Amino acid sequence: MDLAIIDQTKAGVNQYHQDLVRCVLDYAGKYLELPDNTEMSVTFMNNEEIHQYNKKYRGIDKPTDVISFAIEEDGDDLPVLPDELMDAELAKNIGDILVSVDIINSQAEYLGHSYERELGFLVVHGFLHLNGYDHMLGDAEEKEMFDLQREILDNYGLKR
């Protein structure tokens, strides 16, 4: 997986946690059998920044833990490629995830587990949204998404 990590925090996200995000998302990509050339980004930010995104794009006037921006590719507005390029393996950008490091800290403390478990939980949660899963559609969809999320994290080794 081609993963861009952007750190917009004031304090900085340490290399260990950036590497953890890379490893967890690479594992999740393999778990979902995504092509190796799948692209996405994760941006770390503070509450002030994610609050602005939450307000602008979701109409919710407060910070949140994670926001996903999926890149929809329905094919209707994509250019037609020459035949010789049709068989080429083109990278597929699935979207962007924004994560509040402030909320990672507070939720990990509140839930009684490690910062690493909460970080993994949030990036996998956002990753699943980028891949079409949506817990807001109903009880069955919520169960499917959260079961898959737990399965990925447990199998990776980030258990509660």
Curated annotation (Swiss-Prot):
InterPro entries: MetalPrtase_cat_dom_sf_prd (IPR023091), YbeY (IPR002036), YbeY_CS (IPR020549). Its cofactor is Zn(2+). It is found in: Cytoplasm. Coiled coil: none annotated. Keywords: Cytoplasm, Endonuclease, Hydrolase, Metal-binding, Nuclease, Ribosome biogenesis, rRNA processing, Zinc. Its EC number is 3.1.-.-. Gene3D superfamilies: Metalloproteases ('zincins'), catalytic domain. GO terms for cellular component: cytoplasm. Binds 1 zinc ion. One of its GO terms (molecular function) is RNA endonuclease activity. GO terms for biological process: rRNA processing. Belongs to the endoribonuclease YbeY family. HAMAP family: Endoribonucl_YbeY (MF_00009). Single strand-specific metallo-endoribonuclease involved in late-stage 70S ribosome quality control and in maturation of the 3' terminus of the 16S rRNA. This is Endoribonuclease YbeY. It comes from Leuconostoc mesenteroides subsp. mesenteroides (strain ATCC 8293 / DSM 20343 / BCRC 11652 / CCM 1803 / JCM 6124 / NCDO 523 / NBRC 100496 / NCIMB 8023 / NCTC 12954 / NRRL B-1118 / 37Y).
